[in-house]
Amino acid sequence: MKGGKRVQPARPNRINKEIRATEVRLTGVDGEQIGIVSLNEALEKAEEAGVDLVEISPNAEPPVCRIMDYGKFLYEKSKSTKEQKKKQKVIQVKEIKFRPGTDDGDYQVKLRNLIRFLEDGDKAKITLRFRGREMAHQQIGMEVLNRVKKDLTEDSDLAVVESFPTRIEGRQMIMVLAPKKRQ
């Protein structure tokens, strides 16, 4: 829609004249309790301090209001939410494909990659694919998966097995490893 009115997003807290209560429980600029006062008195005190009267808890009886700089309050709030988002780690599932005949050199390279994924905190999905006549030798595939499991869970204590295949699904077996939680 072109040329439409831009709607201001609703504020989460009421400030100054938007507060509807007749009496409020007032908190000062530094967080000290002032007590229960009339709305007009609270607005005067906020005006004297040169800042806003912000309704913190509207559902309380009487509503809790604080004398503070609302712009600074919003800035601090957005800053803290950004910090929390930064700290969150998105866990990805990385996949490595093996074959029953994977040679020792290739196995070591793939194992190094698995170790790197787990150290970075990502889950690892190991897919073992069977082609053609390899389907007749499923026990070789299980040996490869057991070797990976042994190298990563028992020997290096890096991972926890989330799912281990009991049978073949289609032409492949899938094992999922999760990184061990660090203390």
Swiss-Prot record:
Functional note: IF-3 binds to the 30S ribosomal subunit and shifts the equilibrium between 70S ribosomes and their 50S and 30S subunits in favor of the free subunits, thus enhancing the availability of 30S subunits on which protein synthesis initiation begins.
Gene designation per UniProt: infC
Quaternary organization: Monomer.
Any Pfam family the entry gives: IF3_N
Source organism, top-level taxon: Bacteria
GO molecular function: ribosome binding; translation initiation factor activity
PANTHER family xrefs: TRANSLATION INITIATION FACTOR IF-3 (PTHR10938), TRANSLATION INITIATION FACTOR IF-3, MITOCHONDRIAL (PTHR10938:SF0)
Compartments, record wording: Cytoplasm
Keyword vocabulary terms for this entry: Cytoplasm, Initiation factor, Protein biosynthesis
Cytoplasm among keywords: yes
Family annotation (PROSITE patterns): IF3 (PS00938)
The family this protein is said to belong to: Belongs to the IF-3 family.
NCBIfam families: infC (TIGR00168)
Xref: InterPro entries: T_IF-3_C_sf, T_IF-3_N_sf, Translation_initiation_fac3_CS, Translation_initiation_fac_3, Translation_initiation_fac_3_C, Translation_initiation_fac_3_N
One Gene Ontology cellular component annotation held by this UniProt entry: membrane
Presence of keyword Protein biosynthesis: yes
Name of the protein in its database record: Translation initiation factor IF-3
One annotated GO biological process: ribosome disassembly
